[in-house]
A protein has these predicted regions:
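P-loop NTP-binding core
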Residues: 1-304
Length: 304
């Protein structure tokens, strides 16, 4: 069964995109078929994985509006992940979706049509149609599980879909949360970084009550963590206490490798064994085990 994970926080600069790319790459290393969905009009995930957002012929924009089938927009990354890319056109899609009934379900409907076939295009110039064995993509059942991309004849479904939500509480983020089985909230370990967390958690509660009753909040993921400072530890203690929110382990340490990876068009895992990459690998393995057996995710208790 395909698992759909949303990575979301209304605040920018908290390593959402890095988390999506790194978890995806780590799961590919573990033999999983992974689809990444870029829901940010800035196209940061798309750019960080070596695609040029300005040269895309089709993207998630057309997919959400129903103008093209999802398979038409998929591209393959150099690290074996499949990407549904985004560019600035997506900002226009957000405005158009606001005028449509059922706008929160646009992504869920689209993911139900994804065939799981390997996309043909690997360059940054747009996506060629993926093979669907001439049968089209049969929508999968979505009862109680978010949007599960279905397999067509001769293809296999994705094991995991990871959604990079934009830094806002608008209709695109609502689409990501409505389509997801689970959500992780990346949280930079600084005092100002957790301002607005309460509002975001209320949004998750609204989604659970209105559009996705099965959405599970897994917890906050500490990012840009510096174990040498008491400030980072104090922030995590405050978040856990104030919001009664699990703080996931391991924390993602601050490392210059994150910026270097984005500039090179690859994930932080590509050819590297730095502490950040190892932390994401550990979290990816824990998530897969949680989805397989229900084993609880480890939580982080800062030493004080």
């Amino acid at each position: 069964m395909t698992r759909v994970l949303a990575v979301a926080n209304q605040k920018g600069g908290v390593a959402k995109t890095t988390t999506v790319a790194s978890l995806g790459a780590a799961m590919v290393e573990l033999g999983k078929r992974v689809l990444l969905v870029d829901l940010d009009p800035q196209g940061c995930l798309t750019f960080s994985l070596g695609q040029d957002p300005d040269k895309l012929t089709v993207s998630v924009h057309e997919v959400l509006l129903g103008d093209v089938e999802p398979d038409m927009a998929l591209v393959e990354t150099s690290e074996g992940m499949t990407l549904l890319p985004a560019n600035i056109d997506l900002a226009g899609a957000e405005a158009m979706l606001l005028m449509r009934a059922g706008r929160e379900y646009a992504l869920k409907r689209a993911l139900a049509k994804v065939s799981g076939a390997a996309p043909a295009a690997t360059s940054g110039t747009g996506a060629a149609p993926a093979a669907t064995s001439g049968t089209g993509a049969a929508p999968a059942a979505t009862s109680g599980t978010g949007a599960a991309p279905a397999a067509t004849s001769g293809t296999e479904p994705f094991d995991v879909v990871i959604i990079d939500c934009p830094p806002s509480l608008g209709v695109l983020t609502l689409n990501g949360l409505t389509a997801a089985d689970d959500v992780i909230v990346p949280l930079q370990c600084e005092t100002l970084a957790h301002r607005g967390v309460g509002q975001f958690l209320r949004t998750i509660t609204d989604v659970q009550q209105i559009t996705n009753a099965d959405l599970s909040l897994l917890g906050a993921l500490p990012t840009l963590y510096d174990s040498r400072t008491t400030h980072s530890r104090d922030v995590l203690l405050d978040v856990a206490d104030r919001y009664n929110l699990p703080v996931l382990a391991p924390p993602i340490p601050r490392t210059v490798r994150f910026a270097e990876a984005s500039a090179s068009g690859s994930s932080v895992l590509a050819g590297r064994k730095n502490k950040g990459a190892m932390a994401y690998r550990e979290l990816a393995g824990a998530l897969l085990e949680y989805w397989k057996s229900g084993k609880a995710l480890a939580t982080f208790a800062p030493d004080v």
